[in-house]
Amino acid sequence: MTAASGVRMYSKAQAQNSQEQLIQRYAPLVKRIAYHLLGRLPASVQVEDLMQAGMIGLLEAAKKYDAGKGASFETYAGIRIRGAMLDEVRKGDWAPRSVHRNTRMVTDAIRAIEARTGRDAKDHEVAAELQLSLEDYYGILSDTQGSRLYSFDDLLQDGEHGLPEDTSLSHNEPIHGLLDERFQAALADAIAKLPERERLVLALYYDEELNLKEIGEVLGVSESRVSQLHSQCAARLRARLADWRSA
């Protein structure tokens, strides 16, 4: 064995030991994030799959962490772990094309109504625009709630037409570029102009990270009604940010 090969073997062994220590130390963090997310995800998602993806996110965090940027490793790792888990869940999005089509129909209807009236589209107006009964409209909202509501990125996607790459809110690097700043401002403005109850649903779901059942208890409505409110809120934001989404 040459000296160079000996150094390489030593370095490899050190890296492996460091990796194992990292996993042992932060495995509880991965587990905690996995179980926290599980309550907000479809029943088909297995916690073991989340934890496996989270471990990959943890290792990626270890490779890319830069202490000079100010965040603690645990904070940075938490973001990467959660992102890796959500990426894994997104891979399993097998919602029928009809669901994505209905999502776009609702978005287009809301946009048309609000362009005509200059105010928030009401439930019965959207149903009438789609030539549906109110009950059938609520059924569509319940169907479209399912697969992609884990982050603001997902909130603004309809399954086939998402955000422009440069405006992705799941980007883990610092906000960059004028386009991104303008989009963030447009999103903040669109959220501020939502009906009060829809704003509250957003805050409880994304900021407080409550699940739909818990939000229903706060609002005094059923879980299915919260699902409808969330889907309608998502469609309203997609309608108001349509120019950004088609950029």
UniProtKB/Swiss-Prot annotation:
Interaction with polymerase core subunit RpoC, short sequence motif: residues: 49-52
Ranges where the record places region Sigma-70 factor domain-4: 190-238
Cellular component, GO, one term: cytoplasm
Xref: SUPFAM superfamilies: Sigma2 domain of RNA polymerase sigma factors, Sigma3 and sigma4 domains of RNA polymerase sigma factors
Spans traversing the lipid bilayer: none
Keywords of this entry: Cytoplasm, DNA-binding, Sigma factor, Transcription, Transcription regulation
Superkingdom assignment: Bacteria
Coiled coil ranges: none
InterPro entries the record matches: RNA_pol_sigma-70_dom, RNA_pol_sigma70, RNA_pol_sigma70_r2, RNA_pol_sigma70_r3, RNA_pol_sigma70_r4, RNA_pol_sigma_FliA_WhiG, RNA_pol_sigma_r2, RNA_pol_sigma_r3/r4-like
DNA-binding region of this protein: 212-231
Region (Sigma-70 factor domain-3): 102-171
GO biological process, one term: regulation of DNA-templated transcription
Compartments where located: Cytoplasm
Region described as Sigma-70 factor domain-2: 22-94
Record's function text: Sigma factors are initiation factors that promote the attachment of RNA polymerase to specific initiation sites and are then released. This sigma factor controls the expression of flagella-related genes. Required for the flagellin gene (fliC) expression.
Family: Belongs to the sigma-70 factor family. FliA subfamily.
Name under which the protein is recorded: RNA polymerase sigma factor FliA
Organism listed in the record: Pseudomonas aeruginosa (strain ATCC 15692 / DSM 22644 / CIP 104116 / JCM 14847 / LMG 12228 / 1C / PRS 101 / PAO1)
Lineage: Bacteria, Pseudomonadati, Pseudomonadota, Gammaproteobacteria, Pseudomonadales
Gene: fliA
